[in-house]
From Swiss-Prot:
Membrane topology recorded in Swiss-Prot or TrEMBL: Multi-pass membrane protein
UniProt source species: Drosophila virilis (Fruit fly)
Cleaved signal peptide residues: none
Transmembrane segments: 8-28, 460-480
Protein name listed in UniProt: Sensory neuron membrane protein 1
Keywords on record: Cell membrane, Disulfide bond, Glycoprotein, Membrane, Olfaction, Receptor, Sensory transduction, Transmembrane, Transmembrane helix
Chief place where the protein resides: membrane
Origin organism lineage: Eukaryota, Metazoa, Ecdysozoa, Arthropoda, Hexapoda
GO molecular function: scavenger receptor activity
One Pfam short name: CD36
Protein function: Plays an olfactory role that is not restricted to pheromone sensitivity.
Amino acid sequence: MLVHRMKLLTASAGILLFAIIFGWVLFPQILKFMISKQVTLKPGTDIRDLWSATPFPLHFYIYIFNVTNPEEVAEGGKPRVQEIGPFVFDEWKDKYDLVDDVVEDTVSYNMRNTFIFNEKASSPLTGEEIITLPHPLLQSIGITVQRERAAMMEMVAKALAIVFPDAKPFLTAKFMDLFFRGIDVDCSSDEFAAKALCTVFYTGEVKQAKQVNQTHFLFSFLGQANHSDAGRFTVCRGVKNNKKLGKVVKFADEPEMDMWPGDECNRFVGTDSTVFAPGMKQEAGLWAFTPDICRSLGAIYQRKTTYHGMPALRYTLDLGDVRLDEKLHCFCDDPENLETCPPKGTMNLAPCVGGPLIASMPHFLNGDPKLIQDVDGLHPNEKEHAVFIDFELMSGTPFQAAKRLQFNLDVEPVQGIEPLRHLRKLIMPMFWVEEGVQLNKTYTNMVKYTLFLGLKFNSGLRWTLITLSLVGFMSAGYLFYQKSDSLDITVPPNIIRESNKVANAPKPDRQQQPKAHLVPLPGVNLSNPKVEHRDRY
């Protein structure tokens, strides 16, 4: 019995120890190792194929801030805007001219985005709607010259009147013309001023303009970005070090930017946003470099959530206030003078795009209250305007995401150009975009069956083993309790034999036993006994 109890106790302890070591230590490490070997950008892997050409389109939404009182604003009035949208596009992403460097464990490629108008999802909008926005060329050129080349203002004003005859502070046109097809820029004049102004178009300084013949260009917000090169990246493949998977090490063949007055702002941090390393720490955040704004942005952990029944972590992004972070003072015009920093919740894009453009969250969400007060018709809210990503850390999978950004014009009165003389100084919202993705079951099932079923199996196994070990401990304890309640006494054999001899010996006859003779004590008469009573003290 003692041997059986000890075996049961030892087996229970062994099962418990195995459950703890395997369930909480070995299995997670084995799973992470298997994922790290699968999730790399090595040629021939499934991840490489998915990464190089996304097999499904992202959803790209455009919302317009249509100005409903342009004449009033031109005379110094407060702008009133009406949001129109979304205009929905299918955005296809692919990478081409891929070159691997096995020694450095990197891959270089060109990124390309292709936008296709989705009529069904955009309905009832058709893209032919007439909208009114700040004149993107007249205002941008006038404001930039006033700030940087004031001595040339007279010549520029003359050139603008020739190239854009009868131009006003606000431009009214069809949505598709402004954003993709383009509005005409006539550079056919032989006037010296006009030729000087058109030089910036011929040299490619105006990136949004496309030359159609020797004297004409088409300007649009996104036309030049459609199905064209978005820049050459060099990123880590993650074969030698899985933690560096997707990390941007070069852009345009440069190891860092030369855009901002500070090293911290010029560094590439994170990935190209199309892939993330598995097994990242929750507090590390999700960082990605965005060439459109010449900056790396990081999303921070907010809360736990679920997606199609699978646990995920939600990360959110905010432009914050660069004045409060000394490392970000390099995003100010003059890092030594905080008065030159952009308002809270905004980012100055002038060094990046070459014009008075300001980025912000849609409707100036989480921005300086004055930004909202300066314009009627803005209604920021977290649900519709915040940036978020639902992310699975162990596999590095983004389940769903919404990347949102608003583009604004940094407006100010331009004294040298008559149509712009009476404008208010403010940050004028023009439009905001959302790039969204939601993985369907085809791709979430890949994560579910390769990761979560394994995790569920491990969870079920370890708790089953722990339950068995507890049952074993309880059974052993019960047996030990029974032993202590009824002890087994073992008597030596010689004592048993002697005891039997005594028990089996013949008993003497009571009648044959001699009578005992009583010997009286001196002075005691046995024939007349008396009882003596004494007090007891």
